[in-house]
Every structure is written in structure tokens, then in C-alpha cells.
């Protein structure tokens, strides 16, 4: 354990400069001389929909984390719900979770994901996840990356997930979505099948999504909020503003949210997040979020899906704009490389670069041309750094 060498006030000042969802380059140097907080936050538990699981309102998104010490610190703080996926870090993320919680499995809830394939491939994926996680069951198995209401009501989804439950490989099941969230939640609410929905949800989203979250929660679906920090931009890029705890508290005000899974990468970040459970949203927090929203305007795609179908070449703009968030917000270009393996990013960015005039208009005022130009720069740079297998 790190020694307690500094006071609480200075500690808070230091950690407020760290980014939620992206690793600070000098954080390892800081950690060597930084004392951990002796205080354990007052935990808030909420029920994860009809699963009945009592989860900490602030839980942990593990996607960008590569340090098992962060997981163990979260566990020490009392956080009990962890979100990972088969594809994160090409499986290494699940392996880290499994190793960190070996011997503690009964004290944590693990949510992981499976991608749509034929049953044989999906079954193989689940089996790999079980091995990596060092467990014989998954608490919540999520069908990853839905983007249309039809996918939410897919009979193949129902059949496969039902088999996983019957075989004891998954206790509960659900889906995740980054786009068209409101329409997907409304569709899911019509069915009694889904136990959990993992949804991109933060202070930038519309009243329509908030209402859909309420409808889904009323139907018994446990709502897990991701992307709660709206990209997690670093303090230095926002003129010293560090609104990430305020963004988290804003989401926790919505009692229809069972838990939030902010993406953290450092011990300092998870401590800052956990502290959000014991402090109320203030007027000062509101002012911070207003400044943050002003900073984000024209920078971040909310994945609302409003521009789908507008491109004459059929290029999905959200896939390209997510690249900007990976680089500029998360500061994790490894995610760009992973995205290139799963999508046609290179082909699509080439189409964009050859297009004489972009006809796509963002309803939220995003400068589409400028963002696509940035995405092109980051994609090309990542493609050049990939070493052929």
C-alpha cells in the first residue's frame, strides 16, 4: 500500500487534474509519492432492475484500465460491479479482471459482452470469456453494440441468451447501445426478456433519452450508464476545468439509473468517482457542467444517430467520430487500431477524403468537416503504426 505522505486537501487538488477515462502520462510518477485516502466513501446501493442485484451506484468500467491495482483499490472501496468485454484489449481486459478477483468472485458482479455471430461462434466467445475471467458463470452477459430496435427484439438473441441462462453460464442478460438509445430502450421495454441495458448516458443527452430510460426502468430493466463523462477530456484542454465528478453526480441524480460505470485508469480516478456517492449535486457542479458543455459543443459526437442515411456514400459518421473521442478524450489510440480491425474505417475515411463536399449536417452543431479531418489524421497515423502479423 502507498504511504500517506500528503494531506487530504492537497490530495484532492492533485487528483482533480487527472482524466476520467484516459490515462495521464505522468500518473505513474505521481503515484510513487502520492498517498491514498484513508477514508472509505459512504456507499450507495441500488437495485439492478429485476435482477435484484444490489450494486454500488458508482461502479467501474474496465475497458481502458490495464492496471490490476486499480481494480483492487475499487474493491477495497466497496465497489462491486465491473464492466468488461470479450473484445477489450483483445481479451486481456477480461484476463486482468479474472486474475484480480480470483478468490473474491462471490463478492463482485461481473458484466461482459458477446458480439452477434452464429451460435457456434457466440458460444465459443462465451467459453473464452469464462476461462479468461476464471469463473464458471457471468453475472450479466450483454449482447454488444445494438443500433436498431430490430436487433433488440431479434429472436436469435432471445434463443441464444436463454440457452446461456439455462446452462448456468449467465445469470442475467441484456444489451448495449451507443446510438439510437431512446428507440432501443422503448423497444426493449415492450418485452419482458431483457434484464439489463448498458446505455451511453450523460448530461449532454436529450430529454427524449431521459424519458426512455425511465420507461425501460419502469419495465424492470436495470439501467447501467456508460460514457457518463462525455469523452473525459483532460483538464488542461478545458482551461483548468475538471468537471468529471460533477458529470457523474448529474447522472446519479436520475434514480432510474441503477449504476454508472465510468471508465477509469488510475487509483486516483476511482477514488474521485467513488466519492461522488456521498456528495450531492451542487450549484457549483451545475456551473461546471455548463462550462464543460460549452467546451464540448462542436467537439463530441453524442451518437444520437440523427445523421444516419445522409451520406451519399453510406459512410457511418459515428464510427469515424468515435475515433476522435478515442484519441482526443480517452487518449487511447489502441482503441483506434481495434476499431480498424472490426470496421471499415480506412475505406470509409478514404471515401470522405475524396468527397468534394460533405452533405451531412449534425443536428447538434458538430463541425462535421473539421471532425472528419481529425479522424482521418488519427486513423492514418494508427494504420501506419500497425505492425503486420
Where are the regions a protein language model picked out?
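Glycine/proline-rich, positively charged
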Residues: 117-226, 230
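Alpha-helix-loop-beta-strand connector modules within alpha/beta enzyme cores
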Residues: 98-111, 163
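C-terminal segment of N-terminal export signals and the immediately downstream linker at the start
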Residues: 26-58
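Glycine-rich, proline-tolerant flexible connector loops at the mouths of alpha/beta enzymes
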Residues: 81-100
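Structured C-terminal cap/extension of enzyme domains
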Residues: 21, 211-389
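Conserved, mostly hydrophobic/aromatic
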Residues: 48, 60, 82, 97, ...
Amino acid at each position: 500500500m502507498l504511504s500517506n505522505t500528503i494531506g487530504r486537501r492537497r490530495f484532492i487538488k492533485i487528483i482533480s487534474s487527472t482524466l476520467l477515462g484516459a490515462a495521464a502520462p505522468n500518473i505513474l510518477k505521481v503515484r510513487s509519492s502520492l498517498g491514498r485516502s484513508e477514508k472509505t466513501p459512504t456507499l450507495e446501493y441500488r437495485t439492478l432492475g429485476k435482477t435484484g442485484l444490489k450494486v454500488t451506484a458508482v461502479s467501474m468500467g474496465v475497458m481502458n484500465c490495464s492496471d490490476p491495482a486499480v481494480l483492487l483499490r475499487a474493491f477495497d472501496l466497496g465497489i462491486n460491479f465491473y464492466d468488461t468485454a470479450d473484445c477489450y484489449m483483445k481479451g486481456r481486459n477480461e484476463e486482468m479482471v479474472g486474475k484480480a478477483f480470483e478468490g473474491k468472485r462471490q463478492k463482485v458482479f461481473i458484466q461482459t459482452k458477446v458480439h452477434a455471430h452464429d451460435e457456434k461462434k457466440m458460444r465459443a466467445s462465451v467459453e473464452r470469456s469464462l476461462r479468461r475471467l476464471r469463473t464458471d458463470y457471468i453475472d450479466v452477459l450483454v449482447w454488444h453494440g445494438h443500433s436498431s430496435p430490430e436487433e433488440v427484439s431479434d429472436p436469435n438473441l432471445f434463443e441464444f441468451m436463454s440457452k446461456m441462462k439455462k446452462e448456468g453460464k449467465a445469470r442475467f442478460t441484456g444489451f448495449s447501445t451507443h446510438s439510437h438509445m431512446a428507440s432501443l430502450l422503448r423497444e426493449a421495454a415492450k418485452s419482458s426478456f431483457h434484464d439489463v441495458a448498458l446505455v451511453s448516458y450523460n448530461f449532454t443527452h436529450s430529454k427524449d433519452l431521459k424519458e426512455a430510460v425511465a420507461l425501460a426502468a419502469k419495465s424492470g430493466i436495470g439501467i447501467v450508464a456508460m460514457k457518463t463523462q462525455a469523452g473525459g477530456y483532460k483538464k488542461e484542454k478545458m482551461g483548468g476545468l475538471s468537471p468529471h465528478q460533477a458529470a457523474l453526480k448529474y447522472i446519479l441524480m436520475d434514480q432510474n439509473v441503477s449504476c454508472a460505470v465510468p471508465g477509469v485508469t488510475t487509483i486516483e480516478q476511482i477514488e474521485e468517482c467513488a466519492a461522488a456517492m456521498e456528495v450531492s449535486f451542487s450549484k457549483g457542479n451545475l456551473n461546471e457542467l455548463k462550462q464543460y458543455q460549452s467546451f464540448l459543443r462542436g467537439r463530441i459526437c453524442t451518437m444520437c444517430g440523427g445523421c444516419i442515411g445522409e451520406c451519399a456514400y453510406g459512410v457511418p459518421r459515428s464510427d469515424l467520430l468515435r475515433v476522435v473521442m478515442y484519441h482526443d478524450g480517452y487518449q487511447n489510440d489502441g482503441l483506434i487500431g481495434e476499431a480498424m480491425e472490426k470496421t471499415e474505417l480506412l475505406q470509409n475515411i478514404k471515401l470522405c477524403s475524396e468527397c468534394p463536399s460533405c452533405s451531412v449536417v449534425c443536428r447538434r452543431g458538430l463541425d462535421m468537416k473539421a471532425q472528419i479531418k481529425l479522424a482521418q489524421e488519427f486513423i492514418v497515423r494508427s494504420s501506419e503504426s500497425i505492425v503486420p502479423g
